[in-house]
């Protein structure tokens, strides 16, 4: 692993919390995200659980809907992989904000889902705000605790 990989790993290790914004890209994770993971994972500190217990918010968007019971159920190969990486490999505490149907209003074939997409958007925005407030609150507590040490 080169100096660039160590610098990326240092950023992860030094962070109080992480916010990862990763869209579904052609039913998987984008190549640059996979490359970033591969470079950071080469650092033994990351592979050794240096992020155990660290809060991570994964914000992800999907153009369609790949949930149970939909015609393309199981086509999301990004979110499950990211869960494995963040929870099982890194040992971090994962919170997911996922918004489906971002192509409604763009792709005419999805127009029938306009109302559902609006509901999904509202729910995702509310969940994102909740997680953001939680991270901010927890960060303030940690800074106060550290200042008192």
For each feature predicted by the language model, list its residue ranges.
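A conditional alpha-helix N-cap/helix-loop micro-motif detector
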Residues: 1-2, 121
């Amino acid at each position: 692993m080169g100096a660039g990989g160590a610098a990326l790993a240092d950023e992860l290790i030094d962070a109080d919390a992480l916010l990862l914004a990763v869209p579904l890209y052609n039913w998987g994770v984008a190549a640059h995200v996979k490359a970033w993971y591969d470079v950071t994972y080469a650092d033994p500190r990351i592979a050794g659980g240096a992020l155990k217990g660290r809060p991570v918010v994964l914000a992800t968007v999907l153009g369609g809907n790949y949930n149970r019971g939909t015609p393309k159920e199981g086509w999301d190969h990004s979110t499950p992989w990211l869960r494995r990486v963040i929870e099982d490999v890194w040992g971090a505490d994962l919170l997911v904000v996922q918004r489906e149907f971002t192509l409604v209003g763009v792709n005419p074939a999805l127009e029938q889902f306009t109302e559902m997409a609006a509901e999904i958007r509202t729910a995702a925005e509310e969940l994102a705000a909740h997680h953001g407030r939680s991270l901010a609150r927890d960060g303030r507590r940690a800074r106060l605790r550290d200042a008192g040490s």
